[in-house]
């Protein structure tokens, strides 16, 4: 699963996920892309589950790029622990997703195969997505 090798600080504040993606919003590597329409968080497990769904569908053909990385730690306190006594320990990592962000890219497969693979991947994700084809000159 994806997670940072090391961080300057173990814990991070919650923050607010606002605005639209200004970077990483175009198909840069492959021919087809899966773009986020909605806003939210993707955990490392969700990113991996979607990747596996795509990889299994396209079998040996094609190449997949993951354009997001879960770099924000989410901390949780254990079950049935009283309030107070500090912040909980980091349990998992998430990627904050803004509308317009390119999540995955694919190349070396037909459009029908890519569309179906992205449909299977999108079913694993908690945000709305759309299928994008690379424009000429972009």
From Swiss-Prot:
Residues 1-24 are annotated as: Disordered. InterPro entries: Ribosomal_uL16 (IPR047873), Ribosomal_uL16_bact-type (IPR000114), Ribosomal_uL16_CS (IPR020798), Ribosomal_uL16_dom (IPR016180), Ribosomal_uL16_sf (IPR036920). Keywords: Ribonucleoprotein, Ribosomal protein, RNA-binding, rRNA-binding, tRNA-binding. GO terms for cellular component: cytosolic large ribosomal subunit. GO terms for molecular function: rRNA binding; structural constituent of ribosome; tRNA binding. Gene3D superfamilies: Ribosomal protein L10e/L16. PROSITE patterns: RIBOSOMAL_L16_1 (PS00586). One of its GO terms (biological process) is translation. The keyword RNA-binding applies. Residues 1-13 have a biased composition (Basic residues). It holds the Pfam family Ribosomal_L16. Belongs to the universal ribosomal protein uL16 family. Part of the 50S ribosomal subunit. NCBIfam families: rplP_bact. Binds 23S rRNA and is also seen to make contacts with the A and possibly P site tRNAs. This is Large ribosomal subunit protein uL16. The gene is rplP.
């Amino acid at each position: 699963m994806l997670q940072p090798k090391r961080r300057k600080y173990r814990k991070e504040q919650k923050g607010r996920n606002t605005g639209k993606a200004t970077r990483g919003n175009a198909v840069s590597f492959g021919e087809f892309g899966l773009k986020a329409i909605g806003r939210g968080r993707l955990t490392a497990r969700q990113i991996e589950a979607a990747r596996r769904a795509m990889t299994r569908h396209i079998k040996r053909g094609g190449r997949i790029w993951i354009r997001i990385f879960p770099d924000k730690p989410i901390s949780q306190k254990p079950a049935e622990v009283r309030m107070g006594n500090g912040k909980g320990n980091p349990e998992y990592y998430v990627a904050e997703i803004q509308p317009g962000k390119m999540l995955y890219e694919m190349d070396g497969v037909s459009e029908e195969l890519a569309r179906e693979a992205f449909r299977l991947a999108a079913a694993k994700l908690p945000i709305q997505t759309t299928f994008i084809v690379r424009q000429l000159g972009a």
